[in-house]
Amino acid sequence: MKITIIGAGAWGTALAIHFALHNHQVAMWARNAEHLSAMQAELENKRYLPGFKLPDSLTAHSDLDAALEGSELVMVVTSVAGLRDSVELLKQHGAGHLPVVTACKGFELDTGLLTFQVVKEVLPDNEKIGVLSGPSFAQELAKQLPCAVVLASENEPWINEMVQELNTPVMRLYANTDIIGVAVGGAVKNVMAI
């Protein structure tokens, strides 16, 4: 499966490395073209996830169309503040029909919406919207240490298909249709942890 990851921070890079190591073709895109060029040249995200080599099946693009070409799934791994703009860009680039999974946690500041609700508002006809959440850390996933996370969506057949496609010996995904509960749990857990 070809996965496009929007966002080149620590978590986006860790997910990209993980899926690339487990037989997926992965393309990353972020707004900062200079950062992506450095990642391509150094084969590493020295700014946000130093010490982890980018696999050969992972490419970093400053051109969103190139990153989306042939994509079967888009994972938006930005801050919640950057989520709406990223999804708007997907729509503008003709990719609003692609399945979208958010891997960021929180509520949109201006609207109070959860991440999947922001995606639904921007892409109202998209029926394949999900949330990835759970107790996981970028460095641990990049080291290929085991983790378990939830992949939630209101679309049960699709989410079950995605769990089958994305499960690996390292990352165990559990399907859940309580997307509100999963998104709220992810959003408030950091507050409770503090």
Predicted regions and their residues:
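Short, charged/polar "capping" segments at the starts of alpha-helices
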Residues: E34-A38, L109-D110, I159
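Short, conserved active-site loop motifs that form the nucleotide-linked donor/cofactor pocket
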Residues: S57-T59, M171
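Rossmann-like NAD(P)(H) cofactor-binding subdomain of soluble oxidoreductases
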Residues: H61-E69, L73-P146, M162
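Internal alpha-helical scaffold of NAD(P)-dependent oxidoreductase catalytic cores
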Residues: G82, H93, V118, V122-N126, ...
